[in-house]
Amino acid sequence: LKPGNISNIINQASFLAIIGVAQLVVILTGGINLSIGSIMALSTVLCGPMLVREANVPVILPVFLVILFGAAVGTVNGLMITRLNIPAFLATFATMYVARGAAWLYIGKGVFYGINDQIRFWAMGELVNLNGFRITMPIVLVALFLVVMWFLLAKTTLGRRLYFTGSNPVAAEFSGIP
């Protein structure tokens, strides 16, 4: 393997690492989220038209909308699980297929061309080239995200509560952890 190949693999896996850490938090609490990939796809499809050069939309708007949409769907999943007492597997399974179907209906067989240069930099921009090993923006962002999540899970009360709740919810409740 050459340094360029390794950096390319890390760059492409960076998006999956973020999704994986988000899924880790869900699994720590004893749950499961099957819809995470489909929600990511639907978010991308819905905001794709705003990311083309001709749209003249500030990059922060689609990014904010993707985060807002993901949080809204996560809230719906959470309400189905906690208020309607639907098992997490079934609730997120249903959401997965609704999101997948909506993305397919919305995009059809279309493709977005001419992505905005700002978003292209955030998605693929090279910051440093160390003898063929390219450090790109996604690598830096995922490294920052991993450090923040490590700190949150390992060094904060919230992180300890997540671990305790997932390992034994009854014992966690008796210990005063909601």
What is each stretch, according to the model?
Residues 1-55, 79-86:
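Single transmembrane alpha-helix segments in multi-pass membrane proteins
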Residues 88-156, 178:
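Transmembrane helix-bundle core of multi-pass membrane transporters
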Residues 55-96:
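Alpha-helical transmembrane segments within multi-pass membrane transporters and channels
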Residues 21-22, 42, 46, 64-76, ...:
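Generic alpha-helical transmembrane segments of integral inner-membrane proteins
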Residues 3-11, 55-61, 125-139:
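Interfacial loop-to-helix junctions that mark the boundaries of transmembrane helices
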Residues 9, 16-17, 38-42, 60-68, ...:
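Hydrophobic alpha-helical transmembrane segments
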Residues 35, 60-61, 87-90, 157-160, ...:
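Residues that define the loop-to-transmembrane-helix transition and helix capping
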